[in-house]
Amino acid sequence: MEGPEVTDGDNVLNLTHLGLENLNLELVSENKRKDVQQLLLPHNRLVVLPPHVNSFTHLHLLDISNNNMAYIGEEILGLTKLKTLLAKNNRLDEFSFPKELGGLRLEVLNLSGNRFEEIPDQFLQIQTLKSLSLGGNRLKSIPAEIENLISLEFLYLGGNFISSIPPELANLPYLSYLVLCDNRIQSVPPQLAQVHSLRSLSLHNLLTYLPREILSLVQLQELSLRGNPLVVRFVRDLTYTPPTLLELAGRTVKSRGIPYCPQELPENLLMYLDLASKCPNPKCGGVYFDCCVRQIKFVDFCGKYRLPLMHYLCSPECSSPCGSTSQSESDSEDEANAAARRMQKVLLG
């Protein structure tokens, strides 16, 4: 029987949909193994990597998706020119890969549809990685070490059990596409607005508002918030705990510009006064420390969306300087319907 041949003249060895449980790559001549740059093995019944796979010394792409693999052996470490590893829909988890995998110069890693409960440390060592897909797994968190993937442009973590977004994502200078849909995320850290390269953001989760800093994502072209319990009417949440005497004194000092120097106050009070936040209402000029009013305002974004953003005010008497106005009880039905349509652009992505 003749061995499998390189197909299409494109340095591709295609062994897809053959129902193979074992594969003898020695049937491929040594010269042809050196020519092959793409090895396609999806939709078989492979449990482990075929023996001698590391003899494909010029391999750039390896596709082992839709098999029965629970373990990737050290043979993969011999594929020193490998750029793309596709292993979707297997039985892989965080213990399935050799510790030295981080030494490969991978650029694309797609492991969606597996059994990962956390992102393995060795994945977070691949600084050449541009695309990481771990959708449809069992991830519960995104590690802070995600910031080590300094070349990352595309991150797909949809369909997991993630409950929070680490602020360290803001340290990825080239991140352009971020997909976190179908998780359990309830809030977005304001640091995410520092990812100025972000062009597409998918957040179908449990969000009720967005931080106002999101408006600084001027490169954003796609924003999908479908399925979130975002409020669709203007919401005034004025639950307010009166400020302490310490805060009242601090507000008075900062608002009235009362002079003080380090020799006059204890160190803890000096540090406290440095924590003052300015009220966003330009007509107010006040400050707050620990006690503030949280208020949701709808703000026009990119001329297309009305986003519910969180504002922090110094007191209930203060009104937020948001450009958009609230829907009052006297709004006409047509105006209310128009607002609903604008919100639908966000809710439906």
Curated annotation (Swiss-Prot):
UniProt keyword list: Leucine-rich repeat, Repeat
Start and end residues of the LRR repeats are: 14-34, 35-56, 58-80, 81-102, 105-125, 128-149, 151-173, 174-195, 197-217, 219-239
- Note whether Transit peptide occurs among the keywords: no
Q: Which Pfam families match?
A: LRR_8
Where does the source fall among the domains of life? Eukaryota
SUPFAM superfamilies reported for this sequence: L domain-like
Name-wise, this protein is Leucine-rich repeat-containing protein 58
Q: Which organism is it from?
A: Xenopus tropicalis
